[in-house]
A protein has these predicted regions:
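Predominantly cytoplasmic-facing regulatory/coupling regions of multi-pass membrane proteins
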Residues: 1-90, 146-247, 278-279, 286-338
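Interfacial segments of multi-pass membrane proteins
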Residues: 112-120, 238, 242, 259-279
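Transmembrane helix boundary and interhelical junction motifs in multipass membrane proteins
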Residues: 63-67, 99-109, 136, 245-263, ...
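Transmembrane helix-loop junction
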Residues: 74-75, 97, 114, 224-225, ...
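Extended non-transmembrane interhelical loops and adjacent amphipathic helices
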Residues: 71, 86-119
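Membrane-interface alpha-helices at helix entry/exit sites of multi-pass transporters
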Residues: 82-87, 104-106, 116-133, 270-283
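Hydrophobic alpha-helical transmembrane segments of ABC transporter permease domains
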Residues: 128-150
Length: 338
């Protein structure tokens, strides 16, 4: 069940152009003004230990998100392990890091759909995506309550989420006692399965909650790296700001938009504009680097698991990844201490 995915020339050119523009900006930050250049300088001055802690939290979030998909897919007849699910999710994150317009999300959808053999698998996968989104809305609503109470965000996103959750509950109640008579009806497969098994629903919500908590942990580490007071409280404000900024991804990895959202949330927490901007840039940089590394490893894992791949390829890929991580950690953390 390892799909062959094809990309049009337009998609490839769009991705290469976006990445090229980001490289130009990264190599010449003065193009964006003195404030951005100073913010990039602030990123280079922080302790790499906190950045590695944030990277580990991002990896946890990616893996947990893949497991959330697997928990819903398994109830719909999907045949995949948690490791396989995390790898498929990671490939989508890899593409999202280098391509705009959430191209990676479409690829992720295709990869997960290949784990189903029944008719209407695309509809079923769509329902799984909707169920994962509904579970994510629960945790996002909790963060939005905190952000709204702090005066960082308005109340209308919370009202929208309440409507989404109410609609989800209604769909689950309707889907419980219905059976699919057409392909489109398979969109309710996930809701039907989760409604009949509260344990499965709790497992899905738990995995999504772990992913959300890991992202909050990453934001906490970044805030601590820049000396932000009460970094956990600051991170709780960053979470909903990032989710709202991610609704429309115009750049690879949502770089720029995400950094601005983080800077806005931290500034509302009382952080100076320069430090807030540096923290936003650091968050986006670490998240993008983690997505690239985790996604590349995921792609190698899926390739090594294919029937046509040589048996030694998985071991070679794992060994190369371990050596690369050890070298990077030694160069950024251990060597400066010597």
């Amino acid at each position: 069940m390892h799909p062959s995915l094809h990309f049009s020339t337009r998609h490839l050119l769009l991705s290469l152009g976006s990445v090229g523009a980001l490289i130009v900006i990264a190599s010449s930050p003065q193009l964006l003004g003195d404030r951005v250049g100073a913010a990039l300088g602030g990123v280079l001055a922080v302790s790499p230990v906190w950045l590695w802690a944030a990277a580990l939290a991002f990896v946890t979030s990616l893996a947990a998100s893949g497991c959330a998909w697997r928990s819903a897919l398994a109830r719909c007849g999907g045949d995949l392990s948690r490791t396989d699910a995390a790898a498929r999710y990671g490939v989508g994150s890899l593409l999202n890091a280098v391509a705009p317009a959430k191209l990676g999300s479409a690829v992720r959808f295709a990869l997960f759909s290949r784990t189903l053999d029944a008719d209407g698998r695309l509809w079923t996968t769509g329902g799984v995506a909707a169920s994962v989104g509904a579970a994510r809305s629960i945790w996002l609503a909790l963060l939005l309550v905190f952000a709204a109470a702090s005066g960082v965000l308005p109340l209308w996103p919370l009202a929208v989420l309440a409507g989404v959750l109410a609609l989800t509950v209604a769909v689950a109640l309707v889907a419980r006692d219905t059976s699919p008579n057409a392909r489109a009806a398979h969109a309710l497969d996930a809701f039907r399965a989760l409604r009949r098994s509260p344990r499965a629903a709790a497992e899905l919500v738990g995995w999504v909650g772990l992913a959300a908590a890991a992202r909050v942990g990453a934001a906490t580490a970044i805030a601590a790296a820049f000396g932000v007071d009460q970094p956990l409280l600051a991170a709780l404000l960053v979470g909903p700001a990032l989710d709202l900024a991610g609704l429309l991804q115009l750049t690879p990895g949502n770089i720029g938009v995400a950094s601005a959202a983080i800077a806005f949330a931290l500034h509302a927490h009382g952080v100076g504009s320069g430090t807030a901007l540096s923290a936003g840039i650091a968050f986006s940089a670490v998240e993008t680097a983690t997505s690239l590394a985790f996604g590349t490893g995921s792609a190698l894992f899926l390739f090594a698991g294919a029937r046509t791949a040589p048996r030694w390829s998985l071991a070679a890929a794992g060994a190369t990844a371990c050596v690369g991580l050890a070298a990077a950690f030694g160069a950024t953390v251990v060597l400066p201490l010597v």
